[in-house]
Amino acid sequence: MKKTTSPAPSGSIQATPSSSDKRDLPADLASDLNAIDPGRRRALLAGLGAAGGAAAAGLMGPGRAMADPANLPPNVAEWSQVLGPGVDAFPYGMPSKYEKTVVRRYVEWLTATPESSINFTPLYALDGIVTPNGLCFERHHGGAAEVIPEDYRLMINGLVDRPLIFTLDDLKRFPPVSRFHFLECAANGGMEWRGAQLNGVQFTHGMVHCVQYTGVSLRRLLEEAGVKPKAKWLMVEGGDSAGMNRTLPLDKALDDCMIAYSMNGERLRTEQGYPARLVVPGFEGNMWVKWIRRIEVGDGAYMAREETSKYTDLMPDGRSRRFTWEMDCKSVITSPCPELPCRKKGPQVIKGLAWSGRGKIARVDVTVDGGRNWHQARLEDPIMSKCLTRFYLDGWEWNGDTAYLQSRAIDETGYVQPEMAALQAVRGVNSVYHNNAIQTWRINPTGEVENVRLA
């Protein structure tokens, strides 16, 4: 392993895990949790990691260790002795039945209703950088809208020369563009601000996914409408029952935004905005308005609900931190993690993901001793702007001792992923959004992995 010359972060190697039945949650989340029966509350908190752990067990745990000798060499396995399903069995291909535990997961007590809530991508179970469409996390404010494609319309109005209305077929007549980008909810990791809370990478970092989007450049649509010189902002509005809307700077809209109608080569899923959504590379997911139905061009910010009372952070001095669109450089180790413990001593490959809303990932460093020594990870091609990047630390020998794993990403602008203490020094402990702090996993001598906060 190659050591870097960058300094190790200060601080003693003392874990501060939260108890399973007493967690320091943000006030709005704590009130929901406190309304639950104490016994069920303890089971939910303790079981968050177990949900992913059950999935991990199906992948690499006792089920794999207890192989049927009749199917092992030199015997002929049972599946080699019978005809399998024909080509007419699955008109739309599905995952293997043995991967049924790899699913998006939903935390019941997180919100009052699932129609205005979120579920989480199983990052621990994925390889490469592309998220399968069926595993991309969902965030809804009024449930997923079932839009009839023939009735779909996108309006552009306001400070334009020619107000326009596009059908879905109209959008598809424009020259298509395809790009890979990550989409991250601004609240990804938000529950970890005050200490280690959720024991599983699916729950600490699972509000992110990465796909290839195909659609039409938003710039081309605005050029068709003819934007007036005094225009500076857009108000983008969705067709869901919540009427989700956000303000978007015109400069960003003219840069790299698109109206997407496909993801990973197929039409958008309903929960991802079918038949069309806004793609805002590098910006927080709340701005990627789904089921987009209207774009109003104006000369001032619209101060929508989702950018004033919501998606803002209260600073220690009483001011509000808002219009924080860009997602900062971030990384997380996805193996080992609470869902994927170390089963054997010896050589290990540490795997993870890094991303930045500012551009490409330039480097990722990994420590196994809580920051005393850092080692430069191997980045896997392709490395693309505003896209997930896969990293590996090869050849780490785990001898069974307690280890503290962290990753630290650096993007092409030179921005370095911070420790939580550095974020809290500036933003206090009341934040929910834009937590890009370094994550710590503790590997215990048993091989089990847990989410901890170093003192």
Which residues make up each language-model segment?
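N-terminal secretory signal peptides
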Residues: M1-G39, A57, M66
